[in-house]
Amino acid sequence: MPRGLQAELKQKIPFTSREAEAYLSLLRTADALQTQVEAKLKLFGLTGTQYNALRILRGAGPEGLPCREIGERMITRDPDITRLLDRLEDRGFVQRTRAKHDRRVIYGKITADGLKLLREMDVPLEKFGREMLRHVGQEKLKQLIELLELVRAGKAFHRRDAESAE
């Protein structure tokens, strides 16, 4: 009798390998989490990538970051940082300026309105994140973090980063 992911997917044939099962399990879990997070963010009028960019800029401090670096720090790579920042700038959450040392470099920085929005979101999203993973327990969460870091340390991730930099 199928169990776990095999049962969830109503798959009669077992997975061809543990790697295949783990890979599909990661994708399924990430999709489920992302769907719920996106619904929560929608209540604040943001997408996941917009929220990620705002958090990056908040963490960067008042000087902001070059647009290229914002793109490098994104959780989900967004090839069009310019358009992402356009949307956030149109809403008054981000401001862009040219670097004094090199006019070709554009910096993005979070505005007071962007900081205010994030402050409004902090408590509900922190609570939401805890609720989503509370059942796992602290020790298992620590193990999960270590396992995910191990997966990201693999060759395929370094190849992806190298390819996206080209």
Regions found by a protein language model. Name each.
Residues M1-F44:
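N-terminal leader segment of winged-helix/HTH proteins
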Residues Y23, L27, D31, I75, ...:
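Short amphipathic alpha-helical segments with heptad-repeat character
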Residues R55, R83, E146:
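DNA-binding alpha-helical recognition surfaces that contact promoter or target DNA
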Residues D86-E146:
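Charged, amphipathic alpha-helical coiled-coil/dimerization segments
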